[in-house]
Amino acid sequence: MFTFIHPETTITMTDDLSSVFGTEEKQNWTTEWLEHVQYMIALIEDQDEDPTWFTSVIRTTAHLLLEEDVTREEVEAFVDRYSAYDLDHLEDYIEACNELDDDVVHAYIDEQGHVAYAESVLDAYQGQYESMEDFARQMVDDCGDLQDVPHFIENAIDWEVIAEQFHWDYSITIDGYVFNHNV
């Protein structure tokens, strides 16, 4: 029997887990993952850190593990994303995930390699767009520069060329998240 205990989450795993976790293989890797999280909590507590900020990771883990059709790859992807951080950056990662959608934070990590400060993600994130051209058009429109331009001239603007100029300061992910490099 394995019991995973945290102030916000308690999961007790008995010898017969088939009703909760399905196959024996899933039971095995679920146990391994819960042991990994328990180890991380012990590390945090050994450093006299307040582990309450770790709650969102624990909740996400419990949610992932209790999903019937979650795959090992999905759990491992989650593990890879959060465990790449040392304890100094894990709190910023959690804070950023609380402020923004997890997918946005993960896209930022894919672009920058880490979350040094939660504010860096919040400041860099510009929104989600279909293309860099859409982002460029929105930026110009937000500045009010198109208000006095006749519609027929506006249609002649080459937004692709303008978007290319934005690539010096901004990047767009495959999911359309735009980040400012200069923040």
Q: Where is each model-derived feature located?
A:
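Acidic interaction surfaces
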Residues: 1-183
